[in-house]
Amino acid sequence: MKRKHKRLLFVLASFCAAGCALLFILSELRESVSFFYTTSELLSGPQRESNLPVRVGGMVVKGSIARSTDSISFDLTDFKTELNVVYSGMLPPLFGEGVGAVVKGRLLHGKFVADEVLAKHDEKYMPKKYTAPKSSPEPK
């Protein structure tokens, strides 16, 4: 085989290997992308009939949080449609009425059974242990 043909074969093999690696990386990233549906999209789309886990985001409706001995239920809204969510587990500290939340789970018999609840916050949020006290005396 001539040197020119060996070089061409090496370049083609390199491109094939790089393409396979890129395809593998993109397929793995696609599964870990963290998007969510709105309540309207979930209830009107094909995800409604699916038994696969999905993420749904919205605002927790004020006055909708109801705690029982083993679970908590609340309504999520995108200000068009409300979705009843049932969750058993520890809620995040920022969770509350009127707060944005993303839930991951399945829609079963008109209720969304959540496996995970995430509370959303704005870009200015700082944990209390990292914020400075408001009434600190100024140095003289």
Curated annotation (Swiss-Prot):
User: Has the keyword Heme been applied to this entry?
Assistant: yes
Q: How does it sit in the membrane?
A: Single-pass type II membrane protein
**What residues does heme bind to?**
H121, Y125
**Hey, which stretches end up on the Cytoplasmic side?**
1-7
Q: Where does the secretion signal sit in this chain?
A: none
- What is the recorded name of this protein? Cytochrome c-type biogenesis protein CcmE
From which organism does this entry originate?
A: Anaplasma marginale (strain St. Maries)
Which residue ranges does the entry give as Periplasmic-facing topology? 29-140
GO-annotated cellular components: plasma membrane
Q: Which GO terms describe its biological process?
A: cytochrome complex assembly
* Keywords annotated in UniProt: Cell inner membrane, Cell membrane, Cytochrome c-type biogenesis, Heme, Iron, Membrane, Metal-binding, Signal-anchor, Transmembrane, Transmembrane helix
The record ties this protein, via NCBIfam families, to: PRK13254.1-1 (NF009727)
InterPro entries (alphabetical): CcmE (IPR004329), CcmE-like_sf (IPR036127), NA-bd_OB-fold (IPR012340)
- Protein function: Heme chaperone required for the biogenesis of c-type cytochromes. Transiently binds heme delivered by CcmC and transfers the heme to apo-cytochromes in a process facilitated by CcmF and CcmH.
Write down a Pfam family by its short name.
CcmE
Q: Which Gene3D superfamilies match?
A: Nucleic acid-binding proteins
**Which compartment or compartments is the protein found in?**
Cell inner membrane
Regarding protein family, the annotation reads:
Belongs to the CcmE/CycJ family.
